[in-house]
Every structure is written in structure tokens, then in C-alpha cells.
Amino acid sequence: MSGLFGILSPAKRVNGDGLPLFYNIHKSVELQRCHRDTARVSVTLAELLMSVEDEGDDQSRAMDIAVASNFWSSVPSSRVPSSSPFVLSFKDLTYSVKIKKKFKPFPCCGNSPFDGNDMEMNTKVLLNGISGEAREGEMMAVLGASGSGKSTLIDALANRISKESLRGDITLNGEVLESSLHKVISAYVMQDDLLFPMLTVEETLMFSAEFRLPSSLSKKKKKARVQALIDQLGLRNAAKTVIGDEGHRGVSGGERRRVSIGTDIIHDPIILFLDEPTSGLDSTSAYMVVKVLQRIAQSGSIVIMSIHQPSYRILGLLDKLIFLSRGNTVYSGSPTHLPQFFSEFGHPIPENENKPEFALDLIRELEDSPEGTKSLVEFHKQWRAKQTSSQSRRNTNVSLKDAISASISRGKLVSGATNLRSSFQTFANPFWTEMLVIGKRSILNSRRQPELFGIRLGAVLVTGMILATIFWKLDNSPRGIQERLGFFAFAMSTTFYTCAEAIPVFLQERYIFMRETAYNAYRRSSYVLAHTIISIPALIILSAAFAASTFSAVGLAGGSEGFLFFFFTILTAFWAGSSFVTFLSGVVSHVMIGFTVVVAILAYFLLFSGFFISRDRIPLYWIWFHYLSLVKYPYEGVLQNEFEDPTKCFVRGIQMFDNSPLGQVPTAVKISLLKSMSGVLGINVTAETCVTTGIDILKQQGITEISKWNCLWITVAWGFFFRVLFYFTLLIGSKNKRR
């Protein structure tokens, strides 16, 4: 690890409170800041790792302690600027979208009957020549009313807008950022707090560390990073508390927001983007969140965020402001220059007025005026030109490659890059490690919500018991045949319908998945395979419960071998249904839409399965849907399992009349009719003559093409097919980029 971080790791030192010594130094520097009003020293990852004990002999450990002592004694009380600073510059960013506008051929006549059909395209400019600069150690805030372009600018800087649509230049230390490198050295915190509800704060951050920190880093050091981050985020008292949701009490809104930030900065990124991190929070919680962001910036990061309306205290933490109005810059610069700017514009800020609030109110008034904010935009251009000419620009002569290399040597980037194009890893961990972590997290979250699986298991058991009592011990009569067909059709369709619960499960994880994969926390393939594997035990339990509660009670044939095939058919039906519903959950975006689509499609599958109408009677123009029906194959499989014995008789001579108007006549009359039929047909048909065997029933149902084992394997193949489709759906549909 010394090659990666450039420093040695001394033995762990703790104080009387059991906290690492670096935390005390961290606190002492904070106290110095209070007395001397200097910037605070923040602990980078390399400094953190210095406090973690490595295995080695006593001599090596003593040497490490000496190195650590020299290191900490050299840290000044005020923050020392990095010798290789990062500067993110953006120039003339322009982004527009095409929107549909209704075309009215006769606007003077009001609404036209053609309004809904004839459309013309209109261009809306969301960003119009936005320029600026953010430096390491600084916090930049983007302000403006709703629709001003705040989130769009953050998305543009965070590489969340396709390069084909965005015009302008975005550089880091003068060099254009490649998309792959951008994902490694930056992080993006969404406006919504997307977290697993039943994981604790500590577990959430630990799983994030296992995803984002490389496998070469020991478990002990990952835990140390998590503990330091918990202290940095001010979450020590909530570390063992679950995140919570509507049905489970958990952390507060401010704590939840800080956890969201922590999951994205676990790898100590150079650039941190945040979309309105204070929205929905009270003033105290909002201030604490921004205070945490200030510490992150002072540890050597560039922090850029959109914010709706900062308070006076929050304004004092910010280094740069950009005010936007309908995609145009109306102010950019330091918060301290804000009064001077508006004073020179002719609208001085009153002494006791909240400066950002005054600015936003003035911008809204100008937007409602006939001329809009054009005068303010032009004044800002002149003012910026004058400010730029009167100030000496601070340029960095350090190349991006050298700056990143120096950053890695300080431990700032654990999964970073020493080469701008090829030497860095796209993902921090190998495929199998990602699978294990994803599976472990999903199992832990599900285990703390046993009621979800319990309800599903209960539904299967109740359905099985109802079917068992309705179809109790079916006999081998014509009526028993029809009842068997009904039982199998309902049983197979039930297995598919009970899989609909997979829709809300993935939809709840969708945005967590999109956030994590947007910056290469793990591969989409490892996510799909992990969730496929962990779903199998639940399907086995459900299948065993259903088969055990129905097979013997209904009186199905085949003995132990028949039971095993029935069980495996139920299992493959659950598997195919679960895969199909999982695929649909990746396509639809709303729970109710998903349920509607699933119910409709499964109804069509049942309709064309061969139960309501046999294959031979389905019209040719619909026969293709019969072969696409997921219910067809398990349904035909269990029918063959039940009726494949050619020696077993289901209808004897006297039973021929059971399902006809002659079914109620006396037995003697039936025997007389059989004798008459025998004379006409030339075949001796007695009361005990077998008229219909199981093979005859299969022929009547049109089930002669595929063997029962092939039906089983086709059902399994359908499950794999939909899992592959699910993967490609995630691959295509989770790009997280605007067009």
C-alpha cells in the first residue's frame, strides 16, 4: 500500500475516548480556527490510513510511528494550499432542447379541432453562454428561481448531458476531461435521498466503501475510512440507526441527506456535484449539511452545488456564487462583492436585507418586466470584464496528469488515475467481489423486512390450501378430467401472478442503481447476476410450499417421481415469471403502470396457453402468441406428467354419457345403449371398456409436439432470456444523460 499512498502506516493511536488520534488533531485544528479564524485542516484518506495498524514487526511499527509524528508536527495551523491545485473551468456552456408546440392555423378563432394533431418544434435555451471557474478548496453555489437552469448547469458540469447536445468547453487544469476519467474523480449527489431503508448509517457507508474503494485496500482500512467519514459528516450518534422509510422510523432528514453525501464521497473525489442538497431541510439541518460540504472542500475537493435560497449563515460558508435567470448568468463572483454589484447596477441591497433573497426577488421582478433581465445580463458582462482586468488571474501551471499523480500520492484518490487515458481502472473491484457485496446488501436489507417474504409465502400457502380443498381427491371420471385441467391452468397462472411483487422491489432500487452505476460503483452485469442468484432460494421455498400443499390433496398421479416433476415445473414457472416481471420493472417507471401491464400480459398468456382453446383451434394469425405464452409450457408439462400413462383409463364405456343429457338415465338404459352402439359400430363396448386414456386426453388438448422435459427446459430458458433482456434494459435505460 505504500506505493499507492506514498506514506507509511503507523500503529493505531487512540485517546481516552477511544477515537483515533487524527480525530483529536482534527478537533484541535478546529479549535485553532475558532480562535485565529483560519481555514481548518481536513484529513485526507492517506492521513486517515496512517492511523490504522498494519501487520508487521515492532521495528517497522516504531518507524511508522516516527514518520507519523513528523508528519503531524509539520502540519500548520492554517490550511496549506495544495502544491498541485485543481481548477475546473467552463466557458460558453450552451444547451438547448426541442419542445413540441401546438400549431394553430386560426389563432384568432380559439381552439382548433386540429390542435392536438399538428405540432411544430420550438427550441428552448436552458443554458446560454455560461462561464466560470471553481478551484480546489472552494465551494461554488448556483442560485436562481425554478426553471432558471441551476440543475441543468450542474448536470452539464457533471457530464450528465451528452456531448452532442452541449456546446462549450469544460476543462480541469486546462485539459478536457474524458468521460471515463470524469466518473472516477468526481461524484454526483442527487436531490432525492436514495438509500436502502433497513440498513444502518454505518452499514450504508460501509457498503459504499466496499463498492468504491479498491479490493487491494484491507477491510480494516475501509472500516477506518467509514468511521472517519461518519465523524466528518457529524453522524456519530446516528451510526447504528437504520435509515428508515414511511413504515420504519429512522434518521432525521438532515442526517439522511448527509448519509447520501457520504455514500458518494467515500472514495474522496476531486470534484463533488450536488443538486440542491438543502432542499426540504430546516435552517439548522441545511446549515449543518453545507458546513459538512465546506469541510469536504477544505480537504482538497472542488464542491459545486445548486441551492434555492441560502440563509445568511450558509452564505458565509460559500466562496463563489452564480445567479442564473432563464439560462443566463446575471451574477458570478464572491458573495462579498454582491452588495457592490447591485449597488452599481442601481439597486443597492438594504443593510438588514438577506443578500441572496434580495437578489432573487429583484431577478424575479426583472423577469416579469417587458425587457426581462437583459439589462442585468449585459451589466454583469461589463462588470465581470472590469473585475477580471483589475485582478491578477490565478492560473495553475500543473498539468492534469501531474495533479492527479500528486493527489494519489497524498491518498486523495483511492481509485484514481495516474494516466489520463488508460492506466486507471473503470471499476474499483472485480466482477465477483461486486456480486458478493450486492448480494450481501440485498439479503441484509430483505432480512430486516421479513414481512415482505412472509406475506408472499402466506399468499402461496393460502392459495394452495384453497385449491387443495376445492379439488380434493379428484377421481378418474370425465368430470375429474375437466377439474384436473382447471386445477393445472389456475395453478400455473397463479405462480406467474404471485411474481408481480418484483415490480415495486426493483422500482424502489431503480434510482439507487442509477446513482451507483452512473459513477461506476459496480457493473450492471454483476447487479443482474447477483439478484438472480439471491432470488432462487425464495423461489425454491415458495415452490415447495405450493407443491406440498396441493399434490397429494388433489390426488395427482406419478408418485414420488411425479411429485418431483410437479415441484420442478412450479419452480421453473416461478423462475420464468419472476424474470419476466423483473424485466418489465426495468422498462416501466411507475408501480401502477407496471402492475397494469403485468396483469394484462399474463392474462393474454393464460388465454393462449391452450386451456380455454386448444392449439388446434387457435386461428393461424394468433398461433404465434400461443408459442410465446409463458403459461403454455409449464401447463403442458404438468398435463403430460398427469396423463402420460397409456395404460391408465379415465373414461369407461358407461361413463361416456356422464357429460351429456343421458347422464341422468338409469344404468340399465346406458348399458342397453352401449349394446346398440356396439352393433352399429361393430365393436364390443361394454360398461367397463376403456374409451379414453391419458394419451387421448393429451391429443384432445393438442399436446403432442413437445415432451414434458422439453417443456421444463423451455420454461427455464424463458427465465434466462428475460434476465438477459433485463440486463440490456439497464444497459440502455440507465445512461443518466440528457439528450
Curated annotation (Swiss-Prot):
InterPro entries: AAA+_ATPase (IPR003593), ABC2_TM (IPR013525), ABC_transporter-like_ATP-bd (IPR003439), ABC_transporter-like_CS (IPR017871), ABCG_transporters (IPR050352), P-loop_NTPase (IPR027417)
Sequence positions that bind ATP: G144, A145, S146, G147, S148, G149, K150, S151
Keyword Methyltransferase: no
GO cellular component: membrane
Membrane topology summary: Multi-pass membrane protein
SMART domains: AAA
Annotated ABC transporter domain residues: 88-351
One annotated GO biological process: suberin biosynthetic process
ABC transmembrane type-2 domain segment(s): 433-643
Domain of life: Eukaryota
Keywords assigned by UniProt, alphabetized: ATP-binding, Membrane, Nucleotide-binding, Transmembrane, Transmembrane helix, Transport
Localization in the cell: Membrane
Xref: PROSITE patterns: ABC_TRANSPORTER_1 (PS00211), ABC_TRANSPORTER_2 (PS50893)
Recorded GO MF terms: ABC-type transporter activity; ATP binding; ATP hydrolysis activity
Transmembrane segments: 452-472, 487-507, 528-548, 563-583, 593-613, 712-732
Sequence similarity: Belongs to the ABC transporter superfamily. ABCG family. Eye pigment precursor importer (TC 3.A.1.204) subfamily.
Stated name of the protein: ABC transporter G family member 20
Organism: Arabidopsis thaliana
Gene: ABCG20
